[in-house]
Amino acid sequence: MTPTSPQLTEHVLADRVLGGWLGRIAGNMLGKPVEQGEVWTRERIDRYLRQAEALPLTDYLPEPPSREMESALRSEWRACVRGRIHGSCRDDDVDYAVLGLHLLETHGSAFTTEQAGELWLLRLPYLQTFTAERAAYRNLVNGLKPPLTATYDNPCQEWIGALIRADVFGWTNPGVPRRAASLARRDAVLSHTGNGVYGAMWAAALVAAAFTARAPRAALDAALTVIPASSRLARVVRRVISLHESRLNWEETLATVEEETAGLGWIHTVPNAAVITAGLLYGDGDFTRTVTLTVRGGLDTDSNGATAGSVAGVLCGADAIPAQWTEPLEDRVRSAVFGFDGVRISELARRTVELAGR
């Protein structure tokens, strides 16, 4: 295997890909207990952390500081808070990375949207899909073909589901964001349209660019080139970049963008991309700061933490991710994807490296 970019030795590529997997899983686990944007606002998340004496946040969420806080957490919290983690929790944000790897191993980079749908039916349980993916799955079972699978009776076409499936296309195209975006688009149109598809293209390009970018801003700039400049997604990413450049602090930036995207809902691609962008910019390449700011930003916390963690993990590499994030994962993934439950994270990374640049 020859690394795609001349800047990446095989050792560096392997470290960065493993960093992407570890970062995605750790970021997902960090955000999972508070994944419900209409309940867990930025203010409430920080109130939880203050009551638990956990600000600044430098590790997984602490156990709930009160009965009132505990009752609002997702039921999986007991396996996702510090001191209780033994391997990853099962989550769709990780399932789709696993399934995407299997798609590329099975069909290669020339896979079709129809082949992606066939693998869903073969490998992914219907009740472990949500929102746009569940609508598309139902449409597949009823005999519809893409792109009708995305458009028929699917009110979630611009939600974040396609974005969370995109990382593997970046990991396998290091330093080549446009190619990563092309593969992500082919996958995304199974279930999404418009900004839902652009979100997947943007995320894949962002991850791919992180392999050779010197800083998060460079990766963000590269990712913007693969989506329409007039799209609402591109406009909100540029807006966050502009607010960051104007020296607003992180809280002020998110408050401004929250007001400007009001009404889209907490699972829509656009406001979540703003939270991810802010986490990356204000995290400034530091893994811990990036994932904690992103999750504290609220909305779809586990998805946002996963994507920001993937980008930050690629930027710094696995060796530079602090041990408090990686050791509790015990190199093990729980997955609903048939045949993959209990697979080692290091094994997933090794198989991803084998596909890089193909």
Model segments located where?
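Structured, active/binding-site neighborhoods that engage oxygen-rich ligands
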Residues: 1-358
